[in-house]
Amino acid sequence: MSSNKKKIGIQLPRQANPEEVAIRYSLELEALDPVAEIIEVAAQTPEEFAAGVKHMDGIITSWGFRIDAALIEQLENCVVIGVGSVGVDMVDIEAATRAGIVVTNVPDVFIEEVADHAMMMLLGCARQMKTMNRMAAEGQWWSGRPLLNHTPRLMGQTLGLFAYGNVARCTARRAKSFGMHVIAFDPYVSELTISDDGVEPVSMDKLLSRSDYLSVHAPHNEETHHSFSTDAFSKMKDTAVIVNTARGPLIDEAALIVALHDKVIAGAGLDVLEQEPPSADNPLLHMENVLVSPHVASATTRMRPETRRRVGREVALVLRGRWPMSCVNPTVLPKVQLERWQPYPMNRGPNR
C-alpha cells in the first residue's frame, strides 16, 4: 500500500495477519482503497486502543471500546469516525464536534429488517407465542384457545411509536396493514410530517396512556436514557405491551421487571437489553409474558455487506473533502473544510 494514503484505524482484539486486511475489509475498501488503508489496532484495553489510533486520520467502529472524550482528546489527525450502525452511543458526539471530527452512521441500510422484527415482536406478544409454543410442546393442545379467547384482535388496537424516524415509519406502515391505529411522539419531527403519513402525533403522556402496544425507536443519549421507568409504566394500560428494537438503556430494566411482575403492564418484546449479553439469571429471560431475541433485529444476508460498503463510502467522502451522506453531528460543518455537495438536509441525525 502507498505510504501517502490516509490511515483508518479499526479495533481488533487480537493480532492478525496484516496481509489479510485487504480480504477482511474488502467491502469497506471498495470506496476507501484509492484514498486510504485500514490499520487494525490490536488492543485489550481502552488505553491501548487510544495509543493505536492516536495518529490515525479516521476510525471505523460499531463495537468494542467506546470512543469517549478522553480518547478523542488524544487524536491528532482524525477527521472522521464512521459508525457501522444506526445508533452512535459508542461515540461521544459532543466531544467529536468540539474536536472538529465528523461522525457518520448508517441510518437507512437495515430499516426494513428492524421494522420487520419490531412487528414480529408485536405479533408474537399479541398471540402469546411463548405460551402457545410451550403448551404445544407439553401436550396441552386444548389449552391455548381458551386463553386466546380472552385476547382482543389486533385490528383496531393502537400502536404507539416512541420517536418517528426511519424504522418507526416503516413499522407504522406494517401496523396499519393489520388495521391498527398508529400514534407517535417525537419532539424533533413536525406534527405535519407525522400526520402526512396517516399517523396521529401525540404528547408523551398520551402515548403512554393510549397505546395498546408501544414500540421504542429512539437513539440512546442523555435525553432518552431510561425514558421508560416506573413513572412511565404507571401511566400505561395494564394490558399494554412494550417493544424495544432500538437500544436497551432506553428502558429501565429493573423498573420493567417490577412492572411486569406486578402486572402494571402485560408484556414486552425485547431485542435489546441494558446489559448485553445478559446474565443467565436475568428475570426477563424467564418470564412467560416476555419475548427476548439476542440483538438481531437488523440481521439478514444483506445487512452486513451493505453496512460495510456504506461505512466505507461515508468515510471516503470525508477523506476526499466532501460532506458525507449521513452526518450525525452537522453542527461540525463550520469547523471543517468540506464541500457540501448533496441536497441532504442538515438536520439529519442518528434516528433519521
Describe the residue ranges of each PLM region.
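Rossmann-like dinucleotide/phosphate-binding beta-alpha-beta segment
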Residues: 3-4, 34, 147-238, 346-352
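Short beta->alpha connector loops at strand-helix junctions that form conserved
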Residues: 84-85, 101-112, 186, 204-205, ...
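Rossmann-like adenosine-cofactor binding region
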Residues: 67-71, 187-283, 299
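Internal hydrophobic alpha-helix adjacent to the cofactor/substrate pocket in enzyme cavities
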Residues: 306-325
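N-terminal glycine-/charge-rich "phosphate-binding" loop or analogous flexible N-terminal tail
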Residues: 1-56, 319, 335-336, 340-352
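Phosphate-binding beta-alpha-beta segment of Rossmann-like dinucleotide-binding domains, i.e.
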Residues: 99, 107-158, 170-173, 324-330
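Adenosine-phosphate binding glycine-rich loop
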Residues: 287-309
